[in-house]
Amino acid sequence: MWSSSQASTRGVIEVGRVEAGPSHFPKRPAPRNSSRVNLSRTYAIKSCSVSSRTGLCLGQCYHKKSSACKCKLGWSSQPLSSLRHHLRVHSSASEAVLTSQSDFTKLLVGNEKIGVLLLNLGGPETLDDVQPFLFNLFADPDIIRLPRLFRFLQKPLAQFISVVRAPKSKEGYASIGGGSPLRQITDAQAEALRKALCDKDIPAKVYVGMRYWHPFTEEAIEQIKRDGITKLVVLPLYPQFSISTSGSSLRLLEGIFREDEYLVNMQHTVIPSWYQREGYIKAMATLIEKELRTFSEPQKVMIFFSAHGVPLAYVEEAGDPYKAEMEECVDLIMEELEKRGITNSCTLAYQSRVGPVEWLRPYTDETIIELGQKGVKSLLAVPISFVSEHIETLEEIDVEYKELALESGIKHWGRVPALGCEPTFITDLADAVIESLPYVGAMAVSNLEARQPLVPLGSVEELLAAYDSKRDELPPPVTVWEWGWTKSAETWNGRAAMLAVLALLVLEVTTGEGFLHQWGILPLFH
């Protein structure tokens, strides 16, 4: 699925029809004269419009060689917020022109019951929740991608990894109070969003669906059905799209929607990413500006954006737009800071990698050490991919990376808080929901050259079909082993280690004996 964030209020959008055509790459806006410090290789990022067999035009491609389609569009010269002055209500007796915000919102709502589903990762609320939470995480095929032949081992492998990793993870959660605050913060965001929508005359109900812990997405969907929601806006709380975050949650939703008659008939739309929205960018810039003032010499502070990493294969092989969206997001935030007279240097790195496979570089820990060696004395960490505080901000950044920075010679450390319920941010989410309502159950396209992507993005099924079809078109790896493994797959899985683990598991299952049975792991699956 290609991600496209919705247009901001200055966006240029119009319902359109997408037709396949010759390869065409719209010109990407010239990059700003950035002072970002690049500690790794330079990247060539291309934007293209991608057409799928569903007819839905979706956002940015990030790979070296790709074919694209050409969208025949009729562009509107007006932002969505001004459309209310031109919408008309037709009746048998008269035709009335909408001239007020109240009229516009009444048209949007009508007799519909509107719901907003916020999607997030979830987190263990107690130490006893840690191991089952990790099991749910690693049992997700979008997190650990096994070769098709061995996918039946997904859950046994997830059980093994979760048991092995649980003790260390419990130590981390114990250090931040015994559990993740993610649910509490997300519930607060949902309530704040509900109030913001109400203030804008949109009486919507807001639901929270977590991917790996309570309240699970399935629980939220059941409540949506009980409440009789007729129009649903699906809003992942991840600013940038990735296969492993928004993609995983949307794939789960696809299965739920496909199997439920009520949901099949319920109109819905999805906002897969929203990192370009003006309100979000301004909220991030405001938090950074505020934290810079806490330093004795703000102008000498390096702004250090730390994003959650993903395996490199997701970007290079599966076409994940996460890296391209993250880099553009950093540019947009720095552009906003420059408008405020803040011209500090910045850099971007990726944290939270696990396992022996290659992840997106540069790595946060290695970058901190390198910055210390280069003489950086003041560092302000910005958790750019997180909108809520949780273990990766409270423990990994605040404790581990802070200690590493001080040991590396960086004397002054600061950290920008996650957005949480920051008013500008919440208001912007409310605007995003309102802007998507006219397109629930429809398709729309946007001007990629103006960096104003799609506002409603279509149904879950359409989005995933579009992503999957594009992924199938990616060029195959250069080298394929004679037994069907690519070199990248060998790197990804660690062929020798993988085969050894599989052999042990097969022996355990067939003989009923071994260390996994002694530890009480495999009997859980009998």
Curated annotation (Swiss-Prot):
GO biological process: heme biosynthetic process
Physiological role: Catalyzes the ferrous insertion into protoporphyrin IX.
Enzyme Commission code(s) on record: 4.98.1.1
GO MF annotation list: ferrochelatase activity
Top-level class of the enzyme under EC nomenclature: lyase
Name of the protein this chain belongs to: Ferrochelatase-2, chloroplastic
Domain of life: Eukaryota
UniProt catalytic activity: heme b + 2 H(+) = protoporphyrin IX + Fe(2+)
Family statement drawn from the similarity comment of this UniProt entry: Belongs to the ferrochelatase family.
Listed InterPro entries: Ferrochelatase, Ferrochelatase_AS, Ferrochelatase_C, Ferrochelatase_N
Keyword annotations of the record: Chloroplast, Heme biosynthesis, Iron, Lyase, Plastid, Porphyrin biosynthesis, Transit peptide
Database matches in NCBIfam families: hemH
Record has Plastid as a keyword: yes
Disulfide bonds: none
Localisation: Plastid, Chloroplast
Lineage: Eukaryota, Viridiplantae, Streptophyta, Embryophyta, Tracheophyta
GO cellular component: chloroplast; mitochondrion
Pathway in which this enzyme or protein is active: Porphyrin-containing compound metabolism; protoheme biosynthesis; protoheme from protoporphyrin-IX: step 1/1
